[in-house]
């Protein structure tokens, strides 16, 4: 059984990106810039933003964090995004979720220039992805990171049956579409399961690859997996644990302790998919910079 180590793959990728950023600096006397906007004081969001900023600095990218109070109006936020759209030193714009209830998520997504939408959420980027024009878009970071793990671990995917559990716009839908694409990391027969699927264990037991992104702690159990399946756990859930100083522990959407006895390869939580999400955000930001400066990928 192979443990797919996203933490190590992410570290390796960051080193490669650091080299690429330095090569860009030597060619253009400039480096990629990522700006993250956070509205309000959600503690988890602040941790995520700090991690993104730290990762940027580690590879030599410029990182700017704009902190706005929770009472910021939608119009004020959209005006700030427009200013960043027009700033040539900004190559990636990310608005940290969740936003306060009075701000429309869709309006914010639409306001970001598709060429700077390094989260890959703008309909133009989603549409290009669905059409298979992956060189003309940004791919949503978590699904992109999973493809990278398949590539780095030489997971055989062509013609395999892949079951994606979850249909969110951030992971489930783009992941299912990417697994359909004619890529060396995908090219699968794809089934999507979700909260209204009545016979889910029957379906998942047929899968060569299971990607769990349903947001339920340890939902995927050993009896739902066939022997030798590859299991990718996207979930990050807090469960109470009085034995821990924090009072909780992190678990995924998969019952790791039991499923790993049956799987041929599996991602742990933490340390599996999570670290890849930020790494692919950096990769998308670098790609944005390279498109602006007409630099071809190595």
UniProtKB/Swiss-Prot annotation:
One of its GO terms (cellular component) is cytosol. The keyword Membrane does not apply. Keywords: Amino-acid biosynthesis, Histidine biosynthesis, Hydrolase, Methionine biosynthesis, Multifunctional enzyme, NADP, One-carbon metabolism, Oxidoreductase, Purine biosynthesis. PROSITE patterns: THF_DHG_CYH_2. One of its GO terms (molecular function) is methenyltetrahydrofolate cyclohydrolase activity. GO terms for biological process: L-histidine biosynthetic process; methionine biosynthetic process; purine nucleotide biosynthetic process; tetrahydrofolate interconversion. Pathway: One-carbon metabolism; tetrahydrofolate interconversion. It holds the Pfam family THF_DHG_CYH. It comes from the Bacteria. NADP(+) binds at residues 166-168, 195, 236. InterPro entries: Aminoacid_DH-like_N_sf (IPR046346), NAD(P)-bd_dom_sf (IPR036291), THF_DH/CycHdrlase (IPR000672), THF_DH/CycHdrlase_cat_dom (IPR020630), THF_DH/CycHdrlase_CS (IPR020867), THF_DH/CycHdrlase_NAD-bd_dom (IPR020631). Its EC number is 1.5.1.5, 3.5.4.9. It catalyses: (6R)-5,10-methylene-5,6,7,8-tetrahydrofolate + NADP(+) = (6R)-5,10-methenyltetrahydrofolate + NADPH; (6R)-5,10-methenyltetrahydrofolate + H2O = (6R)-10-formyltetrahydrofolate + H(+). NCBIfam families: PRK10792.1 (NF008058), PRK14174.1 (NF010771), PRK14186.1 (NF010783). HAMAP family: THF_DHG_CYH. Belongs to the tetrahydrofolate dehydrogenase/cyclohydrolase family. Catalyzes the oxidation of 5,10-methylenetetrahydrofolate to 5,10-methenyltetrahydrofolate and then the hydrolysis of 5,10-methenyltetrahydrofolate to 10-formyltetrahydrofolate. Homodimer. This is Bifunctional protein FolD. It comes from Chlorobium phaeobacteroides (strain BS1). The lineage of its organism: Bacteria, Pseudomonadati, Chlorobiota, Chlorobiia, Chlorobiales. The gene is folD.
């Amino acid at each position: 059984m192979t443990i797919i180590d996203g933490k190590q793959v992410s570290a390796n990728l960051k080193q490669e990106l650091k080299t690429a950023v330095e090569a860009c600096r030597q060619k253009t006397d400039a480096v990629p810039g990522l700006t993250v906007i956070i509205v309000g004081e959600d503690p988890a969001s602040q941790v995520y933003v700090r991690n993104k900023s730290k990762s940027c600095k580690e590879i030599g990218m410029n990182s700017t964090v704009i902190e706005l109070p929770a009472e910021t109006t939608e119009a004020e936020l959209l005006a700030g995004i427009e200013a960043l759209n027009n700033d040539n030193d900004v190559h990636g714009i990310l608005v940290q979720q969740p936003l306060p209830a009075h701000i429309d998520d869709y309006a914010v997504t639409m306001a970001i220039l598709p060429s700077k939408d390094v989260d890959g959420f703008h309909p133009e980027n989603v549409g290009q992805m669905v059409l298979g024009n992956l060189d003309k878009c940004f791919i949503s970071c978590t699904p992109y990171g999973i493809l990278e793990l398949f590539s780095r671990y030489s997971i055989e995917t062509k013609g395999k049956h892949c079951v994606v559990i979850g249909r969110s716009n951030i992971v489930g839908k783009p992941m299912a579409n990417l697994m359909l694409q004619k890529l060396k990391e995908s090219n699968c027969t794809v089934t999507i399961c979700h909260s209204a699927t009545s016979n889910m264990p029957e379906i998942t037991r047929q899968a060569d690859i299971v990607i769990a992104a349903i947001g339920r702690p340890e939902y995927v159990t050993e009896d739902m997996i066939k022997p030798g399946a590859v299991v990718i756990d996207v979930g990050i859930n807090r469960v109470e644990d009085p034995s821990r100083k924090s009072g909780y522990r992190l678990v995924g959407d998969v019952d790791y302790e039991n499923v790993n006895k049956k799987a041929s390869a599996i991602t742990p939580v933490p340390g599996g998919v999570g670290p890849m999400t930020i790494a692919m955000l950096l990769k998308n930001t670098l790609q944005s910079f390279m498109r602006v400066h007409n630099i071809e990928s190595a």
